[in-house]
């Protein structure tokens, strides 16, 4: 009797919106080896970070059998998927992306794509955020994701870390390899841009991202510039463990007066 192999179940989300090229390219490439469910925002929610919608309901629309859009943030999407839509048959893996643009260095703190993966991690599932350092070669990033998923099939990822993957915007054959990296850092953002709306009211635009401050060897910034895929393991415990003793000593100065 032929044994039927159970397909991997993958939840996809993003912050660029349910109709974005990145997430749909990813779904197409992964469909050969996995059952895909997409739950993503109904519009672009880039920069939403880990925000949740708390003071209004989430409006969910079914677009296709396995595609739902949510009038909410990327975190809302994953929260809804795991706590309602798929609660009786949870996915094996969560992938957020393919993001339209890089998520490098401290960009990760603002990224809705990284936040979607983080929410999956919070809820106990292995999670990957994948971004294209550009807006052209989404197939390259999808092939990178496919290779990572195949690795997961051989040796499943643990839920201890979120993988933040950044893929150079080039043909797959032009990639110069892979490297595990640490996050780099930028200077603070550029100045606000003051403008006037059609009604004569003063408005402000956020300035562009700051210049790279820490982009040396071993950082994600450095590696993608070398046409290599950057994979950074992220942890969600923000505790500065190496500072616990120092802060305890600092507080004792006040209590000893």
Curated annotation (Swiss-Prot):
Matching Pfam families = SurE
Please give the catalytic activity noted in the UniProt record: a ribonucleoside 5'-phosphate + H2O = a ribonucleoside + phosphate
- Which residue stretches, if any, does this entry annotate as coiled coil? none
Q: Which GO terms describe its cellular component?
A: cytoplasm
Care to name a GO molecular-function term for this sequence? nucleotide binding
Cofactor comment: Binds 1 divalent metal cation per subunit.
Its primary localisation, in coarse terms, equals cytoplasm
Q: Which co-factors does it depend on?
A: a divalent metal cation
InterPro entries given in the database record: SurE (IPR030048), SurE-like_Pase/nucleotidase (IPR002828), SurE-like_sf (IPR036523)
Q: Where in the cell is it found?
A: Cytoplasm
UniProt-listed Enzyme Commission number(s): 3.1.3.5
Q: Which Gene3D superfamilies match?
A: Survival protein SurE-like phosphatase/nucleotidase
Q: Which keywords label this protein?
A: Cytoplasm, Hydrolase, Metal-binding, Nucleotide-binding
Q: Which domain of life is it from?
A: Bacteria
Tell me the protein family, please.
Belongs to the SurE nucleotidase family.
Q: Its biological function?
A: Nucleotidase that shows phosphatase activity on nucleoside 5'-monophosphates.
**NCBIfam families reported for this sequence:** PRK00346.1-3, PRK00346.1-4, surE
* Full protein name: 5'-nucleotidase SurE
Organism lineage: Bacteria, Pseudomonadati, Pseudomonadota, Gammaproteobacteria, Vibrionales
Query: Gene of origin?
Result: surE
């Amino acid at each position: 009797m032929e044994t039927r192999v159970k397909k991997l179940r993958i939840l996809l989300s993003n912050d660029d919106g349910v109709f974005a090229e990145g997430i749909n390219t990813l779904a197409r490439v992964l469909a050969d080896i996995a059952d895909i469910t997409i739950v993503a925002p109904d519009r672009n929610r880039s920069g939403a970070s880990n925000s949740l919608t708390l003071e209004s309901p989430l409006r969910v629309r079914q677009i296709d059998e396995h595609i739902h859009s949510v009038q909410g943030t990327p975190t809302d999407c994953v929260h809804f998927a795991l706590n309602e839509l798929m609660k009786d048959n949870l996915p094996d893996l969560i992938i957020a992306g393919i993001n339209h643009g890089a998520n490098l260095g401290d960009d990760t703190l603002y990224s809705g794509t990284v936040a979607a993966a983080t929410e999956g991690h919070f809820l106990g599932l292995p999670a990957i955020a994948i971004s294209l350092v550009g807006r052209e070669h989404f197939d390259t990033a999808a092939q990178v994701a496919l290779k990572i998923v195949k690795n997961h099939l051989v040796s499943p990822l643990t839920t201890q870390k979120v993988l933040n993957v950044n893929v150079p915007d080039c043909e797959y054959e032009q990639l110069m390899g892979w490297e595990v990296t640490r996050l780099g850092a930028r200077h603070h953002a550029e100045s606000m841009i003051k403008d006037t709306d059609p009604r004569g009211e003063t408005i402000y635009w956020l300035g562009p991202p700051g210049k790279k401050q820490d982009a040396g060897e071993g950082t994600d910034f450095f590696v993608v510039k070398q046409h290599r895929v950057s994979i950074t393991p992220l942890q969600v415990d923000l505790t500065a463990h190496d500072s616990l003793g120092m802060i305890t000593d600092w507080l004792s100065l006040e209590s000893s007066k």
